[in-house]
Amino acid sequence: MCDFSEEQTAEFKEAFQLFDRTGDGKILYSQCGDVMRALGQNPTNAEVMKVLGNPKSDEMNLKTLKFEQFLPMMQTIAKNKDQGCFEDYVEGLRVFDKEGNGTVMGAEIRHVLVTLGEKMTEEEVEQLVAGHEDSNGCINYEELVRMVLSG
């Protein structure tokens, strides 16, 4: 069925179960990408939607999937090697480093994360940057990327 070891499959199942809020062995479609990201993958929202069969937005919080359905989706995402690395993300943020000192304004990074590319909600951004701003409102983007990639 898949190329994962028994140990990996057990780890995936454990993470899957942490997202199973009702204990019925299922997660919502809307949680699929979160489980994958918790397991070290970095799929775009578009990639997650594709492996889910491109459901309508109102189905995301209604439809569910079992672990047996999730595993082949995880395999598809894991095979995608174009997920970016530390240097890619740092380079992307360096564009906003006007002073060339390894920091970006917190307000600017918030704006970028809610408006460009894989848009995040304001709540997600606040959760992400919490505790990373210095007294001048700047964020060390290398530290931020390191924290995000470490899970």
UniProtKB/Swiss-Prot annotation:
Gene Ontology annotations of biological process type: actomyosin structure organization; myofibril assembly
Molecular-function annotations in GO: ADP binding; calcium ion binding; magnesium ion binding; microfilament motor activity; myosin heavy chain binding; myosin II binding; structural constituent of muscle
CDD domains hit by this protein: EFh
Domain annotation EF-hand: ranges: 7-42, 84-119, 119-151
GO CC terms, sorted: actomyosin; cytosol; muscle myosin complex; myosin II complex; myosin II filament
InterPro entries linked: CALM/Myosin/TropC-like, EF-hand-dom_pair, EF_hand_dom
Record's keyword annotation contains Repeat: yes
Keywords from the UniProt entry: Acetylation, Motor protein, Muscle protein, Myosin, Repeat
Sites bearing N-acetylcysteine, chain numbering: 2
Quaternary structure (record): Myosin is a hexamer of 2 heavy chains and 4 light chains.
Job description of the protein: Regulatory light chain of myosin. Does not bind calcium.
Protein name as catalogued: Myosin light polypeptide 6
Gene (name only): MYL6
